[in-house]
């Protein structure tokens, strides 16, 4: 966003849509800026801001909130309105952490009803900071939002390598899969997960059902496996994954989730799931992932997926 618009409307619906909107023109006296809280304001949203959640590096709740405060302009389009799952660690990383898929007592989050389940989302920076308040060390998103009637916004291919594979082998595999997707007229964007793997995000036109997107993600994954069965597998059984890269297409099943770009990870080194350009990926060392400590001192200001948001890609088989 770059400008403010003045709009009259009769009411705001429960899904945050304007009823009977009338565009009155642009505001020439105001220019758009993303919200950014002061340190004192951040602390008012947090319970126990000095609580240490990453003991090894003495990273506090406030440190995590400060990081999200800075990267909000970059994370917002991956996060806002998406159905969310959280990995929460109230006692810090490694101590009785748990996945949270339902809103429950997290009253500051926006409720979303999905098949009679009380799920949740956030719509602004304050909501993101509240996730930190609830000790969320990982933010996982679904591939959809209520605003688009839960039509998938992207396909994600999760490349989960065996520990024996080198960083370079995994990166070369990502480039190989990129070329396969290109032949299907699909551009993809890499994200290092903060662990040993890579996610490839493929933006989509919101024109397909959840079942269509799941089926095509499975078909493409099987195609990749068929081309190099000695390197790729779509089987989740550990005994079948030795010295191979597991392509987890199940991330695209309705109700499944994957780590949000720019989210912290719940490990002792406080790594971060980070989107990178293909040029950056070629130089990346998956054995030395990006950490929150590095980003706290120098937060990114530009999104590396420059062309991601303008793509309206269609799945060839369904055109």
Question: Which residues does each predicted region cover?
Answer:
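Short beta-strand
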Residues: 86-90, 188-194, 235-239
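C-terminal accessory nucleic-acid interaction domains of nucleic acid-metabolism proteins
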Residues: 1-66, 76-81, 134-155, 161-167, ...
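Short, conserved phosphate-binding/catalytic loop or strand-edge motifs used
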Residues: 192-202
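Non-catalytic alpha-helical scaffold/packing segments enriched in small hydrophobic residues
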Residues: 176, 199, 216-219
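Catalytic palm subdomain of template-directed nucleic-acid polymerases
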Residues: 201-213
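Short, well-structured alpha-helical interface segments that form or flank functional binding sites
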Residues: 63, 172, 195
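Basic, nucleic-acid-interacting segments
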Residues: 70-168, 172-174, 178, 182, ...
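Short, contiguous, pocket-lining structural segments
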Residues: 169, 192-194, 212
């Amino acid at each position: 966003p770059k400008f403010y618009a003045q709009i009259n409307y009769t009411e705001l619906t429960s899904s945050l849509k304007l009823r009977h909107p009338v565009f009155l023109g642009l505001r020439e006296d105001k220019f758009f800026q993303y919200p950014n809280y002061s340190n004192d304001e951040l602390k008012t949203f947090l319970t126990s801001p000095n609580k240490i959640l990453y003991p090894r590096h003495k990273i506090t709740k406030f440190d995590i909130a400060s990081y999200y405060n800075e990267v909000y302009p970059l994370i917002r389009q991956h996060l806002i309105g998406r159905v969310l799952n959280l990995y929460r660690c109230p006692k810090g990383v490694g101590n009785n952490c748990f996945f949270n898929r339902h809103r429950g007592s997290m009253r500051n989050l926006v409720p979303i009803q999905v098949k009679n389940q009380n799920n949740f989302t956030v719509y602004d920076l304050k909501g993101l900071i509240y996730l930190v308040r609830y000790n969320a060390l990982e933010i996982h998103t679904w591939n959809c939002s209520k605003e688009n009637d839960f039509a998938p916004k992207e396909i994600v291919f999760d490349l989960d390598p065996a520990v024996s594979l080198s960083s370079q082998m995994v990166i070369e595999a990502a480039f190989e899969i990129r070329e396969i997707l290109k032949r299907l007229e699909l551009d993809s964007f890499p994200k290092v997960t903060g662990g040993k793997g890579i996610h490839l995000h493929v933006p989509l036109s919101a024109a397909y059902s959840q079942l269509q997107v799941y089926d095509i993600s499975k078909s493409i994954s099987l195609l990749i496996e068929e081309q190099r069965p000695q390197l790729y597998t779509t089987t989740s059984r550990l005994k079948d994954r030795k010295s191979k890269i597991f392509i987890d297409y199940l991330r695209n099943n309705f109700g499944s989730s994957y780590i949000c770009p720019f989210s912290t990870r719940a490990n002792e080194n406080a790594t971060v799931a980070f989107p990178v350009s293909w040029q950056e990926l070629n130089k990346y060392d998956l054995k030395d992932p990006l950490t929150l400590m590095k980003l706290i001192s120098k937060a990114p200001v530009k999104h590396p997926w420059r062309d991601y948001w303008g793509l309206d890609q269609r799945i060839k088989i369904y055109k």
